Amino acid sequence: MKFSVWSLLASTALAVPLSDWTQQQHPIADPESNGPYNPKNKDPYDHKVDSYGKNLQPLPWRNGEGATMMGPRNKDRERQNPDMMRPPSTDHGSLPNMRWSFADSHIRIEEGGWTRQTTVRELGSSVEIAGVNMRLDYGVIRELHWHKQAEWAYVLEGNVRVTALDTEGGQFIDDLQKGDLWYFPSGHPHSLQGLSPNGTEFLLVFDDGSFDEESTFLLTDWLKSTPKSVLAENFKLAPEVFETIPKKEKYIFQGTLPGSIKDEEPKGANVKKSKLNFTHKMLDQEPRNTTGGLVRITDSTNFPISKTIAAAHLDIGPGAMREMHWHPNADEWSFFIKGRARVTIFAADGTARTFNYVAGDVGVIPRNMGHFIENLSDDEPVEVLEIFKAEKFQDFSLFQWMGETPKRMVADHIFADDPEGAEKFLKAVQNPVEDPIRAAPE
């Protein structure tokens, strides 16, 4: 009788108990080799775990419950999402997805640059804000254009020149670098160009989650869509002058290399400079020092033109956390620049869900939902932008609320049957100093 290799393997597999077979294919790590991701680990307090930083492989075991994984896996994604693989025991109920990575967004590649977007189409909860990540090499131009939505931007790397025109006919030119912002109100025409030595990369933010980068009003698109006789009449030139205009939109393209602003500023008889300032140096702001990091807030208070977008730039130190809080006036749209974090969103009715974020991720937290941002790493900082479709930045601190509410009221709510616990808690909040990023406990 002849046996195939496969039949021999199958008979061997059937001879082994299923639990043993599973462990052979997916070995159960001991506590020393895989941290808390094993059936023996007990953690009643749901401590954070930096699986990526500590090279651990998350598995769905929690306090003795759970099992191995037998099906297809993406281990890299699992390591980036330890609190999805093993959620805190306090998670309960259902929430829409609140996380998207720009790494999962389609990239449009053009001459000397590229662009990708995160909108309500990619992330269904991103209803108030859309984001675009764009790269322009040295001399590369994002062509003259405008759009229905206001545009706010943060320079991630490199140097960029912006131009704009206001409704009074005033022109504006500025050169920006990492950490700088610009804001163009709805309908205001503008352009962008990468500067020496390596161009630029930036995050664009629009005050409408349904924005589409493919549907902006482009100069070349309009000109090619207009009869040449009309162009001639509008510019008082012969129609033949427009024979060589582009036959299709340019969008992103290699331009001639820019000179200095002084050399390039228009100098016609009726040219005038805008009275508006479309740019702002966010990272040059004096930061608010906290016990766990640095906070910079930019809204219409210190960047007056930015009427529809407010933002905070946070440096969350190793082991620190953005305190428990909520925002009453807008959804939070977060962009993670550096580090690894976990965020638990409290949605009322006993519903809470924890998400993990790494560099390049977008997070959404609907207005009024309580949350925090905890740095998973004890060695590296988290750098994140909190962005809001709002004129001013607003938040409520749970710590301040507890400290500025009558002690009896607080104790009756939380520690009615625990006088000792009440005493410790009330002492901790008796001086409710503002501390939006809290240092790790010593």
Give the positions of each predicted feature.
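Conserved SET/PR-domain catalytic core that frames the SAM/AdoMet-binding pocket
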Residues: V132-N133, D137-V140, P185-G187, A312-H313, ...
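Short acidic-glycine-tyrosine-enriched beta hairpin
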Residues: L136, W152, D166-G187, W333, ...
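Glycine- and acidic-residue-biased ligand/ion/polar-headgroup-sensing regions
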Residues: Y138-I141, W146-E168, P318-M321, W326-D349, ...
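A short, N-terminal "cap"/entry segment at the start of jelly-roll beta-barrel domains
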Residues: V16-A130, V230-H313, G317, E323, ...
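Fungal secretory targeting signals
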Residues: M1-L18
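Ligand-binding loop in jelly-roll beta-barrel domains
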Residues: V16-W21, Q177-K178, Y183-E213, D331, ...
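Short coil/turn segments at secondary-structure boundaries
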Residues: W146-Q149, L165-E168, S196-P197, L204, ...
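Active-site-adjacent segment of 2-oxoglutarate/Fe(II) JmjC oxygenases
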Residues: G199-L257, P381-P436
